Curated annotation (Swiss-Prot):
Name of the protein this chain belongs to: Movement protein
Cited InterPro entries: MPV
BP GO terms, sorted: transport of virus in host, cell to cell
Keyword line: Host cell junction, Transport, Viral movement protein
Family under the similarity heading: Belongs to the cucumovirus movement protein family.
Cellular component aspect of the GO annotation: host cell plasmodesma
Function: Transports viral genome to neighboring plant cells directly through plasmosdesmata, without any budding. The movement protein allows efficient cell to cell propagation, by bypassing the host cell wall barrier. Acts by forming a tubular structure at the host plasmodesmata, enlarging it enough to allow free passage of virion capsids.
Amino acid sequence: MAFQGTSRTLTQQSSAATSDDLQKILFSPEAIKKMATECDLGRHHWMRADNAISVRPLVPEVTHGRIASFFKSGYDVGELCSKGYMSVPQVLCAVTRTVSTDAEGSLRIYLADLGDKELSPIDGQCVSLHNHDLPALVSFQPTYDCPMETVGNRKRCFAVVIERHGYIGYTGTTASVCSNWQARFSSKNNNYTHIAAGKTLVLPFNRLAEQTKPSAVARLLKSQLNNIESSQYLLTNVKINQNARSESEDLNVESPPAAIGRFSASRSEAFRPQVVNGL
């Protein structure tokens, strides 16, 4: 079907057969596997001393070549209005630390265009995170669609760049970065409003807060901290839910004597995470 010049989506711009061909390119088992292995889509990428700079393209090299060939063939016969563009509305990165908060180090994360030899941040969208800032969510929004072309020996597309700085004495993994995005491909392109890179500091998970009632360990610790003498504990058939870790265990422990007093579950509410230039 010849290109009409009025449609907005790839499906409307090409015949059903060619649309199916593109779907096979994007969602074949091989393409899905390469999106994971080459691009780390939805996977945790470990930042180590021997991998201080990571450049992850948002499209695998083989898939890029096949998509570019698909658009070029349609363009050469007049069915498509261009040789194809890659559009990524947003890239979202979840960053967590894997070392103590005392470790002195930071991460620099930004979105780059592989067509740029210097790999500079797109429109200055760059986020720096100190180790004690983590965990955090980071987002990037490209302001243009990337042409599906080859520059020199490089397949041009967007890429997530992560740089590790500091962490003297830490040769292993100091942070984990999990990136997610949804790439779109079309024969039309556009420009988009410039939005600064988003950085949201996230409150660390409080795994003890999920307890609905005081555990045996909590009551015992409270009695010791209050310097109140308690009689010997005897095992009985009373079941108390123990949830000091993520898994729950049923322990048979006798309730402390009345002299110990009741455990007060009232606490000041946990502070909420500070949001800086949020998503």
